[in-house]
Amino acid sequence: MDKSQYKNVYVFVEQRDGVVQNVALELLGKARELADALHEQVIALLLGKGVKDKADELIAAGADVVLSIEADELAQYTTEPYAQAITQVIHERKPSILLIGATSIGRDLGPRLSARIGTGLTADCTGLDISEDGDLLMTRPAFGGNLMATIICKEHRPQMSTVRPGVMRAKAADPTRKGKVEDVKINFDKSKFRVRILETVKEQKNMIDITEAKVLVSGGRGVGTAEGFQTLRELADVLGAEVSASRAMVDAGIL
């Protein structure tokens, strides 16, 4: 593989119902740092239907170019249309790096792209940097979080990584930034589509997304009982925080 043909840092922009997800803005901020170190550009992949107007938000967040990929097939996320679209872009544009949020969508999409392209994927990264040789250094927890492993994809491109939400810091939006928006047409092979969305029902729940919280008060087995969590809730109210718990407490049904 001639790695010199592969340039720029690409970010898959996850949007839901036309709303750009925070993890995408966080990845654009990190992509900006990586691209500056490589003297390359940040390219945002904006897939969907009727979402092209989000391009200015992405440019303000750090993108140099927004590839607007609009199609009826992309109106809602399903695996095959999105995988086909991004695979086509990778073959045509040859990105050096592709970053994807480690969300339910990203964890579905990333491995499929990796398999189709024939490159590696480092999942659930908590750190990204550029080596002296210009390779992407991808750091992730290993062995249950007891070790941190730094992984390099030396022989294949693009270098792919999924990144946990809330790990990277989004840059302050700069509305004065200038960028370019390009329309991209995808040639879908609809014979491979296996899933059709018949109806979407949104779950009604009074829960807070703790990844969006600025302060957390968290408890584990030491709290003991549901009554013990009431003390944590009182503390959280004083601090203006949200309450969270360890996996053991959630599995036990205490929270």
Please give the residue ranges for each predicted region:
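N-terminal glycine-rich FAD/FM-binding segment characteristic of electron-transfer flavoproteins
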Residues: 1-255
